[in-house]
């Protein structure tokens, strides 16, 4: 049973629901504690990765360590601009993969050469942060990346750093959407989903590191290697 109401909403409505998980009765407060609890990958980052980065990069405290800021899942195609109904499979696919409702991406201005009008829908995207981000990362590392056999056909990646935003991004393009377990059982519904771009962005709280792009790039590489992400 999916839960879409927040804790404050339930308090206002004076509702006290109980759910069964693995044949045991779980109260409302316990269910919310399970939903917002730190994931295994979060505990691994706080207890092991941060201490390892402090030793390697000579940080004064753990708060200066580079961290994963957000994960952006994006999909777009020229077919979405012509037919509005064709974007529904991609919209549903992103919602099933991330567990979060995506937003539509629209054209910023009209371009007559490409037959585009302003505010015309081009695709959809999702920005993940916090526990949702780590849950998606854990699924991506342990399930999706291990299913890729031919990397040249189903997968492509690129690395880029931005000195203005002090962000070191790592981009992946999963060309085969059936690699995700949520979409594997519904192959016939998501055949038009050509590819899903996944962008990982890091953030540093260290002022010295943020002014030096080369060192920040090294911190980002150390963080990605600690998560054992594919190159």
Swiss-Prot record:
Pfam family, one: Ribosomal_L5_C
Matches recorded under InterPro entries: Ribosomal_uL5, Ribosomal_uL5_C, Ribosomal_uL5_dom_sf, Ribosomal_uL5_N
GO annotation, cellular component aspect: mitochondrion; ribonucleoprotein complex; ribosome
Subcellular location(s) of the protein: Mitochondrion
Keywords: Mitochondrion, Ribonucleoprotein, Ribosomal protein
SUPFAM superfamilies per the UniProt record, alphabetical: RL5-like (SSF55282)
Coiled coil: none
MF GO annotations: structural constituent of ribosome
Gene3D superfamilies found in the cross-reference section: 3.30.1440.10
Organism domain of life: Eukaryota
Example of a GO biological process term: translation
PANTHER family membership: 60S RIBOSOMAL PROTEIN L11-RELATED
Similarity field: Belongs to the universal ribosomal protein uL5 family.
Protein's UniProt name: Large ribosomal subunit protein uL5m
Gene behind the chain: RPL5
